[in-house]
């Protein structure tokens, strides 16, 4: 178990730990280099096979696709943002069946979406270590998903992000393959888009990268397409209502959701004592109901927060599915979160939210919603995340998050609650 300091951050590793990290990075680099060389050979063969063929730009005038595959093998928030591609394609090609290929850990959030004909899951992360090559179950899983994809006979495949998505776009047998040229292997894409995500010096949001690909696939993009929208099934709302009734959450008090954890970097988390201070004030002084969200793996961090609290909050971490989490965030009056998947879910279901950013740049990965308020301290080293590894502080201080104090977050929460709960404003006036 990782030891954390009083703020909930890992300490600076010793020399042995740092050396181990370097050796792991070196082995991964060697493996990826070998893979790159092999895939370049495959790409050259693909290019030779279509040499002399001319492809007209994709549009409703030149193609009428029956089946389209969208591939996003990434975290929950990235998948939510990638649904902008699905929306634009479905509007442009209303008669097409659109399938989504996603990670098993993320796919549930969009499984009930009416714009999708099918959601297929696959996790390529099993191949991250060389020993995976000797495990038969990994080969069987890969062959199974490839057979399923090829059986669908896709007309267009959109590789939204990464080399694995590009490889699976080729493996699907799709006639036209759309993706960023510098995120796929040479020769893999028939309709290549120049550049890549996170180009140096380019401050485009993830949604804008997604919409670049949608345009290349022939979609007509409107300004409204920049706002991600997430479908929440009625069954998920009903299941959530039962859960809230069981734990004792009522409808007559403000409901504040707090997501204290974050994937892909511990520096994206707000400090543990700050969470405890904020929640104590919301429950004790404002009479709000606070619900803590998260996965089962987030429980140790949540328990740290709760151990420092004087008031009581509702801990629903590990008790909701992703669909129920979306219903919970839709039901909440406000979400407070760092840069996380639930932050993007809340934005996509139309919930007011406060997004606390430190190492990551909200211009790249912030919530896209008129109801979102972004807080960041803007110290000299922030943002520092470059997408080459987890968002961890190289100075082991995470000062960018420590500078955002609970009083500021509380002030914004109260602003967002005043319209719905007028008595909150009157009680503040009396104070």
Positions of predicted regions on the chain:
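Catalytic machinery of carbohydrate-active enzymes
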Residues: 1-431
């Amino acid at each position: 178990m990782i030891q954390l300091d009083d703020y909930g951050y890992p300490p600076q590793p010793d020399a042995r730990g740092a050396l181990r990290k370097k050796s792991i990075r070196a082995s991964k680099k060697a493996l990826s280099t070998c893979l790159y060389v092999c895939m370049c050979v495959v790409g050259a063969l693909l290019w030779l096979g279509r040499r002399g063929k001319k492809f007209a730009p994709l549009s409703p005038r030149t193609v009428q696709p029956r089946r389209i595959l969208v591939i996003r093998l990434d975290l929950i928030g990235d998948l939510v943002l990638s649904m902008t591609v699905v929306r634009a394609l479905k509007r442009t090609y209303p008669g097409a069946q659109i399938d989504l290929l996603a990670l098993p850990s993320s796919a549930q959030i969009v499984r009930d979406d009416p714009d999708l004909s099918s959601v297929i899951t696959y996790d390529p992360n099993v191949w991250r270590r060389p020993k995976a090559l000797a495990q038969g179950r990994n080969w069987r899983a890969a062959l199974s998903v490839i057979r399923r994809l090829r059986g669908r006979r896709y007309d267009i495949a959109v590789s939204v992000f990464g080399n694995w998505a590009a490889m699976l776009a080729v493996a699907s047998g799709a006639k036209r393959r759309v993706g960023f040229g510098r995120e796929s292997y040479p020769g893999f894409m028939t309709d290549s888009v120049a550049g890549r995500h996170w180009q140096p010096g380019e401050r485009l949001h993830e949604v804008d990268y997604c919409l670049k690909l949608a345009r290349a696939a022939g979609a007509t993009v409107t300004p409204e397409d920049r706002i991600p929208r997430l479908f929440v099934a009625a069954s998920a709302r009903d299941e959530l209502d039962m859960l809230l009734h069981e734990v004792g959450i009522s409808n007559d008090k403000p409901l504040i959701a707090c997501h204290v954890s974050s994937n892909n970097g511990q520096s994206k988390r707000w400090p543990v004592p700050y969470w405890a201070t904020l929640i104590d004030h919301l429950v004790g002084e404002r009479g709000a109901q606070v619900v803590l969200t998260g996965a089962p793996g987030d429980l140790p961090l949540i328990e740290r927060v709760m151990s420092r609290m004087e008031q009581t909050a509702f801990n629903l971490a590990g008790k909701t599915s992703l669909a129920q989490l979306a219903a919970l965030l839709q039901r909440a009056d406000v979400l407070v979160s760092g840069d996380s998947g639930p932050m993007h879910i809340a934005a996509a279901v139309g919930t007011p939210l406060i997004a606390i950013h430190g190492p990551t740049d909200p211009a790249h990965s912030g919530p896209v919603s008129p109801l979102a308020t972004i807080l960041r301290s803007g110290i000299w080293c922030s943002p520092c995340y470059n997408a080459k590894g987890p968002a961890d502080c190289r100075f082991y201080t995470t000062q960018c998050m420590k500078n955002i104090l609970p009083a500021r977050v509380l002030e914004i929460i109260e602003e967002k609650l005043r319209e719905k709960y007028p008595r909150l404003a009157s009680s503040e006036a009396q104070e």
